[in-house]
């Protein structure tokens, strides 16, 4: 069973085209203005059109207002909302009810205590994404090019569906898949020449590394 692969922080048609040709299952657009990967919703909507029906379109937001979500959902028409802020379980339920879209809830991880919060969202969020906690002083909640201790995920019940993120690149993604058996992986900075600038060559190298990985990806419910 191959893992889902999400290329996040996309901003150009060339990068999107290469991601789709290589088999990306998800493409992500970031609507957090402090990020170098930020994109205006109307431009994201235009860039996303070739992906419809080929990959899931993911809108990545950080503690958005209702007005911000209204604009993003109206223009982009995403398949999934990725919540990368401090959204409570109740807020996640409200967002799901308002927009009728599945939610992927992000948790920033440094220690085992960071994962204890997951339990309150089980049965509420449709999927989880585990990213490395941002270094002190960083304004970005993700996309910082750092990893966390993947062994912390070993306590998770096999029925918990998650994507692994945080510092993944061509050099470590195979090891990450073997050690975590994650059913999905998310990459952004690992396929960039500089923050916000995706490289089609690095996208190719990342997919090559995934394809050569001998990883027993965990099936749902196992």
From Swiss-Prot:
Q: Which InterPro entries match?
A: Aldolase_TIM, PRAI_dom, RibuloseP-bd_barrel, TrpF_fam
Pfam families listed in its UniProt record: PRAI
Identify this protein by name: N-(5'-phosphoribosyl)anthranilate isomerase
- What does the entry give for GO biological process? L-tryptophan biosynthetic process
Which protein family is it in? Belongs to the TrpF family.
Whichever gene encodes this chain, its name is trpF
Keywords assigned by UniProt? Amino-acid biosynthesis, Aromatic amino acid biosynthesis, Isomerase, Tryptophan biosynthesis
Q: Report disulfide bridges, numbered on this chain.
A: none
Identify which top EC class this enzyme belongs to: isomerase
Keyword Cell wall biogenesis/degradation in the entry? The reply is no
HAMAP family named among the record's database cross-references: PRAI
Swiss-Prot/TrEMBL catalytic activity:
N-(5-phospho-beta-D-ribosyl)anthranilate = 1-(2-carboxyphenylamino)-1-deoxy-D-ribulose 5-phosphate
Query: What's the EC number here?
Result: 5.3.1.24
One Gene Ontology term of the molecular function aspect = phosphoribosylanthranilate isomerase activity
Cited NCBIfam families: PRK01222.1-1 (NF002295)
Q: In which pathway does it act?
A: Amino-acid biosynthesis; L-tryptophan biosynthesis; L-tryptophan from chorismate: step 3/5
Q: Which domain of life is it from?
A: Bacteria
Q: Which organism is it from?
A: Rhizobium etli (strain ATCC 51251 / DSM 11541 / JCM 21823 / NBRC 15573 / CFN 42)
Q: What CDD domains does this protein map onto?
A: PRAI
